[in-house]
């Protein structure tokens, strides 16, 4: 089996959206061992979509499409596949009722134009979409498979994992495939790969690294005769990866960086107060987005003025972290101070950052210097602060636990 990925939508070819779906699917197909022949984007034009589908039909046995299955007149993927295969397109009453129920569950009435999303051809098996109104298609015809999914990334990814992959497995040798992602922070992608390169080369599972906004993710793909064997292989590889990456690993799969920090606070029974000074409040935003933030985050103070030139930022941060904790009546205090001075160009601004964490066990500080655009400086400092806070909390909780047991 080989594959073609076709991303459909005018917004992809006029520069308004980046085709992240194709990148995701390329990685997923590689993990399944399915060679990808080519990837293309095409606008919302019926003739062009049919033309690209015909080419894909000639070049590969698996065609994966995303986009073009919404409710509007320019959503034409269903019509194009029907034309390609010369099959009639009709409304499926059961699908229509599911779409009506989706709206009703949210206290809404389904707009009539959404009825077209319930259309299907005879060779199509509908793919459920529990988080959207657009069912996908799984089509088997003349030795080919067409998988049609929404263009919304979160809908597409869930449909791919829960609906498409299980249906594809019998065609690629059967068995079970399971995935797990280890999330790391504080190590660059090249350093992560350096630490685990032999595991990548020798493991029975596929291991790949991806640089993300919240650190470097290590994706494990386990293909085994059954689900139990696949899970055991995931566990085995995860243990080996954790042994190499150590405390840089902050979670797996759905774990967020903010959630990992709050979990450490909860484990110790501590609360936190934050002062961010000219830093863009990146870390405060990261924590505030978490459902459990209110349990552990006492206060967050945002200062927007430029820090003074005539002071040591590290000493100011140390003092500020302690005073922040005392003022809020919290167990821990965090201070983030950023000073950005102009460079020869905006992209060469000089940023200095001082971080300090006060815990019941100790006060620790760290400084950074970076030359970049001010927005990038603040983004990087936010990640550094998250990593620094997490490690400080981890170390402090270990110290307290050791002292208590002694």
From Swiss-Prot:
Gene3D superfamilies: 3.30.70.2860, CinA-like, MoaB/Mog-like domain. This is CinA-like protein. It comes from Thermomicrobium roseum (strain ATCC 27502 / DSM 5159 / P-2). The lineage of its organism: Bacteria, Pseudomonadati, Thermomicrobiota, Thermomicrobia, Thermomicrobiales. Belongs to the CinA family.
